[in-house]
């Protein structure tokens, strides 16, 4: 990480490093869903090399501008940025070898649409490598409603793990492989609840956060089309 631009490191709000288990190869085309400040774009760009291509998609113009600055500082010329939603990617059918995403899909209400779109843009045998936030059980309806009312960081849209992985498999993905699971500590939970920052995300009630301690996990997984 020492060679990553300091701005990209400062803007990083992920829950893992999907490029570390995406099995990226030289010359591949990669789509990064919700690229944010660009740290995973840079890591992926270096892995696929000058003959490869990395496309970063984000709906927030300010994040794309910051990602552009970070990519320019990195010196990479194989990274492209595009405004848009992760449910509608500017790629043709079968146009990508890999789709990565880092702590973003939990924020999207229609997760099935995201994975249908990832399936569409991947070539046969292509893969997803995802870091995301899930819960170990179904949360109390009132508690979930309060999180969703504030869309509390990465907690507001987190699904129960089994239901989430089942949804992905139902869209057609196979060979599901869980790389790692990590139960968030109370301190990590607080940070995730206010991602990307207190200026953007209101703080959830302390008692609501206490109610989900031990029930929120980051997971890293890979699957193939």
Describe the residue ranges of each PLM region.
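Short, glycine-/aromatic-enriched active-site segment of Class I SAM-dependent methyltransferases
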Residues: 134-155
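A short acidic, Gly/Pro-enriched loop at the edge of an enzyme's catalytic core
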Residues: 87-98
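Short alpha-helix
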Residues: 156-172
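A short SAM/SAH-binding and catalytic strip from SAM-dependent methyltransferases
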Residues: 97-110
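Class I SAM-dependent methyltransferase SAM/SAH-binding core
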Residues: 17, 26-88, 113
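C-terminal lobe and adjacent flexible extensions of AdoMet/dcAdoMet transferase-like proteins
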Residues: 171-225
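A short glycine-rich, Lys/Arg-flanked "PGG" loop and its adjoining helix->strand segment in the class I
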Residues: 112-127
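Class I SAM-dependent transferase core
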Residues: 1-31, 207
């Amino acid at each position: 990480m020492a060679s990553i631009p300091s701005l990209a490191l400062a803007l990083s709000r992920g829950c893992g490093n999907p490029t570390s288990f995406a099995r990226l190869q030289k010359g591949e085309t990669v789509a990064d869903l919700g690229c944010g400040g660009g740290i995973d774009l840079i890591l992926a760009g270096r892995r696929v090399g000058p003959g490869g291509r990395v496309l970063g998609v984000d709906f927030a113009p300010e994040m794309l501008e910051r990602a552009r600055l970070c990519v320019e500082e990195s010196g990479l010329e194989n990274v492209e940025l595009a405004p848009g939603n992760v449910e509608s990617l500017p790629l043709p059918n079968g146009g990508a070898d890999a789709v990565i995403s880092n702590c973003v899909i939990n924020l999207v209400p229609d997760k099935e649409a995201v994975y249908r779109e990832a399936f569409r843009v991947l070539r046969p045998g292509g893969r997803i490598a995802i870091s995301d936030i899930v819960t170990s059980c179904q949360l109390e309806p009132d508690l979930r409603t309060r999180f969703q009312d504030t869309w509390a960081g990465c907690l507001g849209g987190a699904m129960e793990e089994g239901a989430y992985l089942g949804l992905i498999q139902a869209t057609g993905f196979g060979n599901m492989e869980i790389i790692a699971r990590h139960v968030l500590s109370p301190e990590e939970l607080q940070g995730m609840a206010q991602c990307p920052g207190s200026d953007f995300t209101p703080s959830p009630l302390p008692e609501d956060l206490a109610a989900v301690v031990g029930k929120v996990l980051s997971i890293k997984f890979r699957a193939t089309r």
